[in-house]
Every structure is written in structure tokens, then in C-alpha cells.
Regions:
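Accessory beta-strand-rich segments of carbohydrate-active enzymes
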Residues: 4-5, 9-16, 27-36, 55-185
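A short, compositionally biased
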Residues: 5-10, 83, 211-214, 276-281, ...
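Short strand-coil-strand connectors
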Residues: 14-16, 81, 92, 222-224, ...
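Active-site-adjacent substrate/metal-binding segments within catalytic domains
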Residues: 40-66, 70-79, 84-91, 97-100, ...
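Extended acidic/polar, glycine-enriched regions
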Residues: 112-118, 203-310
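Short acidic/polar inter-strand loop motif in beta-rich domains
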Residues: 126-133, 287-292, 324
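Surface beta-strand/loop "capping" patches
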Residues: 179-210, 312-319
Length: 353
């Protein structure tokens, strides 16, 4: 089964022929402040003196020490849980890929690029603001920065009525090595409704040369993997209880599907309308009698509908329904507790509770 081998620490940050220590998760501006190269952006108007940071390119580096234990795995993956935002990733000089979305996880298979001993992992960060300058926004308008809506990062980084203009920048979430079987479950997506139906969509990382139609149905393909593998599905209403429902299906390719019907499903309701029961699932990938990959999670039985009704010739009213019942929706805004997303900690959240 895949497992986390190690988190990657001991990063450095290089720019203008200078190299300083960097913290990951973290932020480039915060690293510069720790090194005494910029002022405290939270003091007075000093944030205006750091605007140059988001105009520069920076390079992160760290070392992956590959021993025989690591190299004995079929698959070794370097995982980035969050890079803000534009970057190119290299291992030993080989380009692994580019990032352009702060909110996505990026995964790169590196087993064939590793050699025993030290391997250099490099992340070349590209200026967010310079990239935005190239975006054509003719005909668009937005407050604070008309180009911000085209960049997949926290929009408050471009300034707001409650925050200064501090464009956070860097590796803001964990970086780690996963290793294990070459064949594994990439993702499980669950769609459930208020009738007790639950559909499980399972994506495997099999090497398949295939063509899919617009509905995602494979119309032709050739498989490099064995197709006598099995997927086992288990569903229960308690975290560690014996499965109430289970099913086994044959693997048919990269995308697989299974359905369950629960005649006595307990429905999920918003607070004030009922309870919020969650069901637990576990999906196992079996090969040659051994479980080689597992994914688990929780889901709820519910149906969410936005009902639109005419209110005249040109006006439409709308009503949100949960499980066919009209609900009144209200809420509030949460202002981030830090301008620099990468330095937010659980302790800072607890201090506010």
C-alpha cells in the first residue's frame, strides 16, 4: 500500500545570488523577514516596501536522500499539497511539471529519476504579478485588481477593504514523499441522494492508452496493466463498525464504478432541520490476493436543489431545497487570520476559539 515516506524539510531560497534558509510550509516574504532582508509588513505602512517581492523570481531547493529502502518501491511520488502559485518543478535537472493553481495538489512520479544518495529537488517560483501583466482583461472590471479573477489563488492577496495589498508567494503547504505499489487508487468520488442511492466513481492510475467520449465512457483502449484486479467496497454508519454493505467488482480500466442502494438511509439535514449523519466508506484494490491500495472517507445521503421560478416576464425567484424541503440560507464571512497563508497554524485558530 502507498504510504508517506518522509516530509521534505531543510529548504533553501535563492534570489539575486543570495541564498537563505526557507521554511516549508511557509512564505517567501516571511523567509526574507526572518533573514533581516525586509521590514515587518504588519508594522505601519511597511507592507508597501515589500511589493518588490512579488515582482521577483525565487528558487527553492532541497535534497531527497534516496536509500535502498526507498528505491525498492515500485512507485515513488513527490507530493506538493500547495504552491502559490506559478512554478516549475525539477528533479536532478529534469522537468517534472508546472503549477498554476494554489488550491490544487500536484503529484509527480519520480522513481525512475532517483539514484541512490542525494537528489536535488528544485522549485522555480515565477513572479505572480509579472504573469498577471500578460493577461488581457479588456472588457473586464473588478475592484482592487481587474486581473486577479484570472489567477487561481486567494483573492484577498491583492488587497481588500480589511487587508493590505500583500501578495503571498511560495510553497504554502506540505511537501512529502509517498511510496508503495505502482498501481493504486487515485481518487474516489461519491454521489448520493435522498433516495438512498450512492454511486462510487473510482479512478486508478493504471497505464492505459484510451479514448473517452464526452460522457467519460471509454470507446477504445489498450491496457498495459493486468485486468484481473478487483475493487472491494465497504460502507457503514459507524467509523469502526463492520460494514453494513459491501460489494466486489472487477477492474475494467482506469475508471470504475459501483452503485449501492440503502433502503434505510438516514438523511443529512442542515442544522435546525434535522441531524447530520455521515456514512463511512472504504475502497480496496486487490491484486493477486493482496490489498495494494486503500482509500477511505465519509459521505452523506442528501439531495441539494436550486429551484428557479418565474416572477414576471423578466424576473426569476429561486429557492434552495435540501431533500425536497425549502431551507433558509444565511451565513457570514470568515476573514483569513494571516495575510501569509503558509504560516497559518492550528494554534492560531485555537487562539480565536
Amino acid at each position: 500500500r502507498e504510504k508517506m515516506y518522509a516530509k521534505l524539510n531543510n529548504w533553501t531560497l535563492t534570489f539575486d545570488n543570495k541564498t537563505i534558509s526557507a521554511q516549508v510550509p511557509g512564505d517567501i516574504t516571511v523567509d526574507l523577514y526572518r533573514a533581516g532582508l525586509v521590514k515587518n509588513p504588519y508594522f505601519g505602512l511597511d507592507y508597501k516596501d515589500i511589493e518588490w517581492v512579488a515582482r521577483r523570481d525565487f528558487t527553492y531547493r532541497t535534497t531527497i536522500c534516496a536509500d535502498k529502502e526507498l528505491l525498492n518501491n515500485q512507485s515513488v511520488t513527490v507530493v506538493f499539497d500547495g504552491i502559490d502559485v506559478f512554478a516549475d518543478v525539477y528533479l536532478n535537472g529534469t522537468h517534472l511539471g508546472a503549477t498554476k493553481n494554489m488550491f490544487l495538489q500536484y503529484r509527480y512520479e519520480i522513481r525512475n529519476l532517483l539514484h541512490e544518495g542525494n537528489n536535488t529537488l528544485t522549485v522555480e517560483m515565477h513572479s505572480t504579478l509579472n504573469a498577471m501583466d500578460k493577461i488581457d482583461t479588456t472588457g473586464y472590471y473588478a475592484i482592487f485588481n481587474e486581473k486577479r479573477m484570472f489567477v487561481r489563488k486567494a483573492q484577498c492577496h491583492f488587497g481588500w477593504d480589511w487587508a493590505p495589498k500583500i501578495c503571498a508567494y511560495g510553497i504554502w503547504n506540505d511537501v512529502y514523499i509517498e511510496c508503495g505499489s505502482k498501481q493504486k487508487i487515485n481518487d474516489v468520488y461519491v454521489v448520493a441522494d435522498d433516495k438512498g442511492n450512492a454511486a462510487f466513481f473510482v479512478e486508478l492510475n493504471y497505464n492505459i492508452n484510451s479514448t473517452y467520449d464526452t460522457l467519460g465512457v471509454m470507446v477504445k483502449g489498450s491496457y498495459e496493466e493486468k485486468l484481473d484486479d478487483k475493487l472491494h467496497f465497504y460502507v457503514s454508519d459507524e467509523p469502526f463498525a463492520e460494514a453494513d454493505t459491501q460489494k466486489t467488482v472487477e477492474v475494467v480500466g482506469k475508471k470504475n464504478f459501483a452503485c449501492f442502494v440503502n433502503q434505510s438511509a438516514k438523511l443529512w439535514w442542515p442544522v435546525g432541520y434535522g441531524e447530520q449523519p455521515l456514512y463511512n466508506y472504504r475502497v480496496e484494490l486487490e491484486r493477486d490476493g493482496k490489498i495494494i491500495s486503500v482509500k477511505s472517507g465519509r459521505f452523506a445521503y442528501r439531495t441539494v436543489s436550486l429551484v428557479e421560478e418565474p416572477k414576471g416576464d423578466t424576473l426569476y425567484g429561486y429557492q434552495l431545497q435540501i431533500n425536497g424541503v425549502d431551507v433558509f440560507v444565511k451565513g457570514s464571512n470568515w476573514i483569513p487570520i494571516e495575510c501569509f497563508t503558509g504560516v497559518v497554524t492550528d494554534d492560531k485558530y485555537r487562539r480565536l476559539t
